Regions:
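N-terminal basic, amphipathic alpha-helical segments
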Residues: 1-118, 122, 127, 138-140, ...
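Short, well-ordered alpha-helical scaffold segment located
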Residues: 40, 232, 311-312
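Active-site donor-binding loop signature of nucleotide-sugar glycosyltransferases
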Residues: 77, 98, 208, 230, ...
């Protein structure tokens, strides 16, 4: 097992995680094969056992490997059929909440300081109408944030700003049109089904199992678009495993299929690195990625965004390009500043540390 670690490049555990994961996905490390012991691999690579343990734990969190008594870590990702072994895995449900979230609030002092700074620096510019797709500065800041934290590399033109997920759902439906049948997780956030119903499109309810959309339901559905919240589905708290994510990607590989990926609550992963996005995993440019800042900053902020596949940018422009951006210019510049100066990511890291501490007690 030859892995190359650059100790000058941080974090080291993510280098190891990425290389092992690639071997698993590419079937170099096959289903049920045993990984080296933590101590043996640490000695071979000249790194600490803590580093190896952290990499293995992340692989386990994402469903690529599992820890077995007296056997150590073994590969649980099965490329042949797309499902991780679940025989010895206990799945815990963490129901999500719709109202007041359990995460520490974004510091009001930081928010007010940033607002004053933006007012001072940008003045009358803040009274001007926003470009229809959102301010370029915010779209560029989101682009850089996604590249740093979610493995998503896109052009600024692919990012559209809107006032929350409901607004963006409606625009996605109008863009893709009524010729599609939409598959929705069941149960899911109530307003999702209400939006599809109000839009008068055909949709199916796809039941959830312990690791994402039920296998049989996904294989039998007539839907050509699936709407999924893979990191943490509301209200069940179900998270899609790595195997399930790859299954979704394979499902969408057929012609004229799309995935709408709502990355709800992924920022609050207990692991340092959240689960891979479907947008990053897919190589066929058929995933529409969506997220908001309602949980991470405040529901009253009403700022969301979606990332379009490149080939849909022109379609969006032709069908919906005339719509004005519904987010005030002032709040767009405030969020831009929070993303660019690091305050947003510092808050996320504080929340993660608190969550890890709470889990340990």
């Amino acid at each position: 097992m030859k892995y190359v670690i650059d100790k000058e490049k941080r974090p080291v555990y993510l280098q190891l995680y990425n290389q092992i994961r690639e071997d698993i996905v590419n079937d170099i490390l096959r289903f049920d094969s045993k990984l080296p012991s933590i101590r043996a691999l640490a000695e071979e690579l000249g790194i600490s056992t803590v580093t190896v343990e952290h990499a293995y734990a992340l692989l386990s969190d994402e469903g690529y490997v599992e820890s077995r008594e007296r056997s150590g870590y073994v590969v649980s990702f099965r490329k042949a059929d797309g499902f991780a072994s679940t025989a010895k895995t206990t799945h815990k449900y963490h129901p999500a909440t719709e109202t007041k979230h359990a995460y520490p609030d974004f510091p009001l002092s930081v928010l007010s300081k940033t607002m004053r700074k933006v007012l001072t620096e940008h003045g009358d510019l803040l009274l001007e109408k926003s470009p229809n797709y959102g301010c370029t500065e915010l779209r560029e800041a989101i682009k850089q944030y996604l590249a740093r934290n979610r493995g998503i590399s896109v052009d600024t033109e692919q990012i559209i700003i809107g006032s929350g997920s409901e607004y963006l759902y409606e625009h996605i439906i109008m863009m893709l049109g009524k010729s599609h049948t939409y598959g929705i997780e069941s149960p899911s956030y109530k307003k999702i089904e209400e939006i599809y119903h109000a839009s008068e499109v055909d949709y199916e309810l796809l039941p959830l199992s312990h690791d994402g959309i039920d296998n049989a339901a996904l294989s039998k559905t007539t839907a050509t678009v699936i709407h999924t919240t893979p990191y943490r589905s509301f209200p069940t708290g179900v998270s899609a495993t790595a195997s399930k994510l790859h299954e979704y990607v394979r499902w969408a590989n057929q012609k004229n299929r799309y995935i709408i990926e709502d990355d709800f609550e992924s920022e609050f992963s207990v692991s340092t690195k959240p689960t891979d996005t479907l947008f990053a995993l897919s190589k066929n440019d058929n995933v529409i990625y969506l997220n908001t800042f309602s949980k991470t900053i405040s529901p009253s902020l009403r700022i969301g965004y979606m990332v379009l596949p490149k080939h849909l940018v022109k379609t969006y422009e032709e069908k919906l390009g005339f719509y004005s951006c519904t987010v005030p210019t002032f709040m767009q510049y405030v969020l831009t500043e929070l993303l660019n100066n690091g305050d947003f990511e510092r808050h996320i890291n504080r929340v993660r540390r608190k969550m890890r501490k709470d889990l340990a007690t």
